[in-house]
């Protein structure tokens, strides 16, 4: 690699789709001679059970890259190359050398570009019409946007529990303000744009309601990975998983490093809402 690039300080998100697809071409096929994606995942810190769960993925290399990037603050390009070297896949590094360098250079160039707004402008206030007037209490003139204590990530099948959550946290002495998409967001806008705006700019934290249906939801998958990318390593305690009923499927591996608020344990149910409210009330 070029000596002008400090790859140990460039995050994994600098690598674009083309490089990730080519990594999959090298690592996805099971190989009795050369190390494959399983060896890479093990060196990334994934457990045996987590790696076994990835076996069902069509592109396990893509999944481990995404999940490693979301859960590990040390997920840098340099670290990935070091892992490939440790598992004796120097052939992969050599073949993708130019593409990786190009992606990293483009990433640095984007980072060095001047911001679109001048310093005097508060970047917390949305400036495009698409990000104005997206919730019930938003100022239609584009003034101060409506803010929330937490964004609730949930599936439609879990809406009864979300309704109870709103009663327990909003209509009691806790007086928290939750962002429930079906209740608070106005129709007619791009779902992905609005969701990212709410999670990043409008909500201090995100509560993830875990269930079997959650694991099959593309929307929940996007929301969770987006929130994790904003706080790698959970340094800001931004994301709080909640389990309120028993599951047949394995708990999502991407959230296993976070403390869970578990409603399924009868012995702790009386403390459940107080603990959740306190976590959402932190600065």
Curated annotation (Swiss-Prot):
One GO BP: positive regulation of gene expression
Description of its domains: The intermediate domain (ID) is required for the phosphorylation and activation of IRAK.
Protein's organism: Salmo salar (Atlantic salmon)
Protein name per its UniProtKB record: Myeloid differentiation primary response protein MyD88
Subcellular location: Cytoplasm
Stored Gene3D superfamilies: Death Domain, Fas (1.10.533.10), Toll/interleukin-1 receptor homology (TIR) domain (3.40.50.10140)
Any one Gene Ontology molecular-function term assigned to this protein's record: Toll-like receptor binding
Keyword Cytoplasm found: yes
Described function: Adapter protein involved in the Toll-like receptor and IL-1 receptor signaling pathway in the innate immune response.
GO cellular component: microtubule organizing center; nucleus; perinuclear region of cytoplasm; plasma membrane
Record's keyword terms, sorted: Cytoplasm, Immunity, Inflammatory response, Innate immunity
Region annotation (Intermediate domain) ranges: 101-142
Protein's UniProt keywords contain Ligase: no
Residue span(s) of domain TIR: 146-280
């Amino acid at each position: 690699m070029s000596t002008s690039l400090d790859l140990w300080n460039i995050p994994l998100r600098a690598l674009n789709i083309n490089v990730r697809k080519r990594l999959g071409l090298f690592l996805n096929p099971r190989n009795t001679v050369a190390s494959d994606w399983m060896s890479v995942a093990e060196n990334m810190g994934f457990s045996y059970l987590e790696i076994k769960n990835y076996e069902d993925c069509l592109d396990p290399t893509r999944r481990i890259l995404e999940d490693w990037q979301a859960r590990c603050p040390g997920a840098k390009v340099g670290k990935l190359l070091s892992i490939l070297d440790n598992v004796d896949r120097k052939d992969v590094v050599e073949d993708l050398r130019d593409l990786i360098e190009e992606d990293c250079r483009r990433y640095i160039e984007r980072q060095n570009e001047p911001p679109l707004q001048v310093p005097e402008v508060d970047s917390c206030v949305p400036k495009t019409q698409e990000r104005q007037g997206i919730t019930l209490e938003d100022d239609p003139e584009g003034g101060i946007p409506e803010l929330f204590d937490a964004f609730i990530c949930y599936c439609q099948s879990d809406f009864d529990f979300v309704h109870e959550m709103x009663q327990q946290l909003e209509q009691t002495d806790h007086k928290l303000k939750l962002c429930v998409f079906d209740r608070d967001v106005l129709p007619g806008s791009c779902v992905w744009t609005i969701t990212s705006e709410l999670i990043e700019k409008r909500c201090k934290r995100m509560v993830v309601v875990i269930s079997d249906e959650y694991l099959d939801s593309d929307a929940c998958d996007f929301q969770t990975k987006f929130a994790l990318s904003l706080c790698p390593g959970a340094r800001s305690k931004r994301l709080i998983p909640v389990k309120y009923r028993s599951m047949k499927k394995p708990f999502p591996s991407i959230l296993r490093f976070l403390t869970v608020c578990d409603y399924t344990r009868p012995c702790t149910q009386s403390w459940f809402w107080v603990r959740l409210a306190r976590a959402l009330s932190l600065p």
